[in-house]
């Protein structure tokens, strides 16, 4: 099922932030939730996603977010079918404008109703993408054959407290470390980027939960700013780690102005993705030019 999901994402667009997304088959779409439900039935014998609370896979707050995001995508798809008078899952620009009117999104400051509707859509898709990533990582951890931790691997890379290895992935030992020193939120992304280490799903959840802390304290942390600048100016393409920082809500809290462009669309012939996704592509292209 995971291989099928990867193939589907490649077919319908590897980014969930395309201007005209496929509501059902696209990344962060309805099919991703259905895949999660199918796998959970096999792995945990659950009847619906709310049974995953008992299994300890999701927190109550996460299931609430997942359920609301799923409902929003389902209602969007229903409106799309009604407008098209046929089965149609491609949320094109004309349909976006019409659906935003039907749902009665209003003008807010400089945001048009369609921009507000699509921002809500992209946030729902981002929530689904982030939470299904956690689910699939937990499944992988729980059901893969237990492999003895490679002693050579562990000694090749030295980690200092509060960072530890958990199934060959970097993790933070306890939440209290973040509460006392929020700058380690940026530090773990820095380590992940430069040492090619995946971040453990439980830690991704923790980072998302604590992301607002850096909004309050990052101004006085010169080290956080320094680490972030090292990431975006490094000899390794930073697009992937920046996306992960965005998915965990860290980037928008670390750079408050960036939060305003997350999920923001521009309906013109030059933009095929949301503004935040175009920003990641621009940084990636700058890296490619620098290394030609």
Q: Model segments located where?
A:
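Conserved helix-loop functional segments at active or binding sites
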Residues: 288-292
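Non-catalytic interface/linker regions that flank or bridge core catalytic/transmembrane domains
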Residues: 1-271
């Amino acid at each position: 099922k995971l291989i099928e999901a990867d193939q589907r994402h490649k077919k319908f667009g590897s980014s969930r932030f395309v201007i005209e997304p496929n509501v059902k088959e696209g990344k962060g779409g309805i099919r991703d939730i259905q895949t999660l439900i199918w796998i959970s039935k096999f792995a945990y014998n659950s009847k619906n996603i709310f049974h995953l609370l008992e299994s300890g896979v999701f927190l109550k707050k996460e299931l609430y977010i997942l359920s609301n995001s799923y409902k929003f995508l389902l209602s969007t798809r229903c409106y799309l079918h009604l407008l098209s008078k046929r089965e149609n899952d491609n949320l094109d620009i004309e349909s976006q404008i019409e659906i935003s009117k039907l749902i009665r999104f209003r003008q807010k400051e400089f945001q048009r109703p369609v921009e507000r509707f699509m921002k809500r859509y992209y946030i729902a898709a981002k929530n689904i993408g982030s939470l299904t990533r956690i689910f699939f990582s937990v499944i992988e951890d729980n059901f893969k054959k237990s492999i003895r931790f490679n002693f050579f691997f562990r000694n090749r890379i030295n980690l200092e407290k509060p960072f530890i290895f958990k199934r060959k992935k970097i993790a933070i030992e306890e939440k209290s470390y973040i509460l006392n020193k929020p700058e380690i939120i940026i530090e773990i992304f820095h380590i992940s980027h430069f040492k090619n280490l995946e971040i453990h799903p439980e830690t991704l959840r923790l980072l998302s939960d604590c992301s607002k802390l850096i909004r309050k304290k990052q101004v006085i942390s010169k080290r956080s700013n320094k680490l972030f600048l090292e990431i975006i100016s490094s000899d390794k393409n930073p697009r992937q780690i920046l996306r992960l920082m965005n998915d965990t809500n860290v980037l928008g809290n670390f750079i408050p102005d960036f939060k305003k462009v997350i999920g923001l669309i521009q309906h013109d012939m030059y933009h095929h993705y949301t503004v935040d996704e175009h920003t990641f592509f621009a940084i990636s292209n700058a890296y490619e030019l620098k290394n030609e």
